[in-house]
Curated annotation (Swiss-Prot):
Region of interest called Disordered, as start-end residue ranges on this chain: 1-30
PANTHER family for this protein: AMME SYNDROME CANDIDATE GENE 1 PROTEIN, AMMECR1 HOMOLOG
Biased segments, Low complexity type: 1-18
Organism ancestry: Eukaryota, Metazoa, Ecdysozoa, Arthropoda, Hexapoda
AMMECR1 domain location: 38-232
UniProt-listed InterPro entries: AMMECR1, AMMECR1_dom_sf, AMMECR1_domain, AMMECR1_N
Protein name: Uncharacterized protein CG5902
Coiled coil: none
One Pfam family hit: AMMECR1
Annotated organism of origin: Drosophila melanogaster
Amino acid sequence: MSNSHYNNYQQQQPHSSNGDPEYQHQQMVHQPQRFSNGHGMKTVAVPDMCLFCFEVLDCELNNVDGPSVPVFSNDAYPLFVTWKIGRDKRLRGCIGTFSAMELHHGLREYALTSAFKDSRFAPISRDELPRLTVSVSILQNFEEAQGHLDWQLGVHGIRIEFLTERGCKRTATYLPQVATEQGWDQLQTIDSLLRKGGYRAAITPETRKSIKLTRYRSQEIQMHYKEYREYQERRAQFGKVQC
């Protein structure tokens, strides 16, 4: 993993007006990918969600009317939309919300917000579209942990609340896949998340024990632009098709 990719995950996230952060953090159409952390939960994440996010971004970049109302569930969930680019899938934008949003509106909003308003990156351009992969993460099963190590790598996403060295309350999160993608253990993940949230002092065992940690699970579905275009071509040839 390159240092630039590592550093992208550590940068401070922008905050909403109420003081709570809006957390910035390839899958074939026919065989959707779901991470093991989604096992045991009602299936929510489906390939149509990735198709919809690509359609929303494609229409916006080409200045045409957006897609029609999607056919997948419109139940309300916390969600994240992540854009990555290139064969090595470098992070290109990732923003989501812990507030439950109806999926049709939420995915439309965060497909664009993560593409254009992630402060770590320049807005995604039309030339980049063919190299993109989109990931949709649907968050469920939030639980207050009994300590900073009361969660499992590769299973849980974590959200921490803590006080900075100046006594300011901060929050930060990593989705379940981040730690395993980076090759971190639990302590490395906690320390990186503290830095991401703006903690600048030395991190001690007491610092880690003082945080409030909430764990959650996520269903993630991914799709590359190539699969999106294949779907578009089939639809143009045969009319509406199911994934």
